């Protein structure tokens, strides 16, 4: 085996190791820069039920204004509860995912779409 071939293999192996280390560092830094919170899971779940991205954006804005996606949120003056801020005491005993389901049903029954509910909220500061 010529000496150049062995050196080439060592050099090639070193480059591959270097690239692998860089990729590993990059993946690690991405993991650390974005850690999932319960709110991220609530939004992901809501987005899975509201497929249209534009409609989800409206819902995200609406419920951020209403409760900041907090399932324990309670508006004492208005008597509204949960992520969707509905006037139903049952919501305070429901998990966040069930609150999202109920809230989406309410939006559909009252406003047909999240964007219609958001437009109403912009005019009246409630939906």
Question: Which role fits each region the language model picked out?
Answer:
Residues 71-73:
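Major-groove DNA-recognition helix of helix-turn-helix-type DNA-binding domains
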